[in-house]
Amino acid sequence: MEDFVRQCFNPMIVELAEKAMKEYGEDPKIETNKFAAICTHLEVCFMYSDFHFIDERGESIIVEPGDPNALLKHRFEIIEGRDRTVAWTVVNSICNTTGVEKPKFLPDLYDYKENRFIEIGVTRREVHIYYLEKANKIKSEKTHIHIFSFTGEEMATKADYTLDEESRARIKTRLFTIRQEMASRGLWDSFVNPREAKRQLKKDLRSQEPCAGSPTKVSHRTSPALKTLEPMWMDSNRTAALRASFLKCPKK
C-alpha cells in the first residue's frame, strides 16, 4: 500500500500526509491504510478548490491552467493540510473579516462565494451513515458538509453540492479509479476492512523478520490504470505557493 500511495499521489500531498501523521505519532510505513485515506482526503480537498475563482462581480467561474486571467481570487481557501496553529489563524482571520461563526472543529475549506466553511468527507462506507456521523460531530448548521464515496455516490447539506456537475464528476472519477487500481493490486479489501488490514500487517511484519537486513525489490512498473491516476489536475503555480505555505512550520 505504501508503494501505491507514493506512486499514486502528488508528492506534495504525500509530504503533507506524512507530516500530519507524524504530528500525532503515527508511522505512514506501518499505518498504510490511514496514510492512503489521508492522501485521498487531501487530494479531494485540492480538487474541490482547484480552478474555481471569483470574478470582479463576485460570480464563481472556472479557469483552466495556463489561462491569462489567473489574477482572480480563489473561490476556496484550503484549510486542511496546514499546521494546526496556522490553520486556526486562517480560520480566525476569515471569521474576523467575514463575520461568520467560528467553528468548533477545524473545517477543510472556506467558500468565499457562499460565505461558509466546508467539511469534506471521503468514505468507504454508505454516504448517508458517514454524513450523519460528521453532522453529529460538528453540531453546527453553519458548516456545510459534502461527502463523497469511492462508488460515485455523494451527499451534501440540503442537497446543495456547491460545485458544478463536471467538477464533481472529476472527483468521483478519480476516487473510482483509485478504488479500481487498489482492487487490481489486492489492496482494496484490506482498505475497506480495518480488521483484515491489521491481520495482514501482522502477517507482513512476521514475513519480514528473517530478512530484515536484505534489500527489498520494488516494482516500478506502471499499469495503464495507474497512468490515469497520476495527478495532473493541480495548478503548478498554486502548488508551489501552497507547498511553501503548508509546509512552513511556525516558529515556537
Curated annotation (Swiss-Prot):
The record marks K202, K203 as: Important for efficient shutoff activity. Residues 202-223 are annotated as: Disordered. It is found in: Host cytoplasm; Host nucleus. Keywords: Decay of host mRNAs by virus, Eukaryotic host gene expression shutoff by virus, Host cytoplasm, Host gene expression shutoff by virus, Host mRNA suppression by virus, Host nucleus, Host-virus interaction. GO terms for molecular function: RNA binding. The active site is at E80, D108. The record marks R195, K198, R199 as: Important for efficient shutoff activity and nuclear localization. The probable endonuclease active site in the N-terminus and the basic amino acid cluster in the C-terminus are important for the shutoff activity. The C-terminus acts as a nuclear localization signal. The C-terminus is recruited to host protein complexes involved in nuclear Pol II RNA processing. Belongs to the influenza viruses PA-X family. This is Protein PA-X. It comes from Influenza A virus (strain A/Duck/England/1/1956 H11N6).
